């Protein structure tokens, strides 16, 4: 199946098509205005959003620092059982063998001694040294 259009023009006209049977109704600027309303609305909403974001940032920047930051006493750090960094260790960041920086975090236990917190994001070194597809086999232990 093929579809073709064949326009024939009278010899005395230019390249504008001739309307013969339908009424020539001009919709005028109403269609153009209706088509432009969604884009105008979207532009207005975008401007309103930017204005509110700028106003919020200005109000946050105008607040004094003393109201937003609460100073913490040193005694509160030592009395708090939460995680705290060991102040006696001078280099807080060391380079590991792979070249990335590593921070040391210590946990103060109930007995008062400080132990390093195990890194839960990185697997232990012995698991990284395994080769091949042995990591697919589940490790069974009786412990």
Swiss-Prot record:
Protein name, as recorded:
Opalin
Regions of compositional bias (Basic and acidic residues) in chain numbering: 85-96
Q: Where are the transmembrane segments?
A: 31-51
Which branch of life, at top level?
Answer: Eukaryota
In this entry, the parts of the chain located on the Extracellular side of the membrane are 1-30
Intervals, Cytoplasmic compartment: 52-143
* Function in brief: Central nervous system-specific myelin protein that increase myelin genes expression during oligodendrocyte differentiation. Promotes oligodendrocyte terminal differentiation.
Q: Which InterPro entries match?
A: Opalin
Q: Which UniProt keywords apply?
A: Cell membrane, Glycoprotein, Membrane, Transmembrane, Transmembrane helix
Expressed, tissue-wise, as follows: Expressed specifically in oligodendrocytes of the brain.
**Residues carrying sugar:** 6, 12, 14
> Any keyword Transmembrane helix?
yes
The annotated region (Required for plasma membrane localization) lies at: 79-95
Region called Disordered, residue ranges = 1-20, 79-103
Query: According to the record, what induces this protein's expression?
Result: By leukemia inhibitory factor (LIF) and cAMP analogs. Suppressed in the presence of astrocytic or neural-stem-like differentiation factors such as bone morphotic protein (BMP) and fetal calf serum.
List the biased-composition ranges (Low complexity).
8-20
Topology relative to the membrane, per the entry?
Single-pass type I membrane protein
The record's statement on gene disruption is: Deficient mice are born the expected Mendelian ratio and have a normal body shape and weight. No obvious abnormalities in gross anatomy or major myelin protein components nor in the compartment of myelinated axons and oligodendrocyte maturation. Nevertheless, deficient mice display increased exploratory activity in a novel environment.
Name any GO cellular component annotation: cell-cell contact zone
Compartment(s): Cell membrane
State the Gene Ontology BP annotations: regulation of oligodendrocyte differentiation
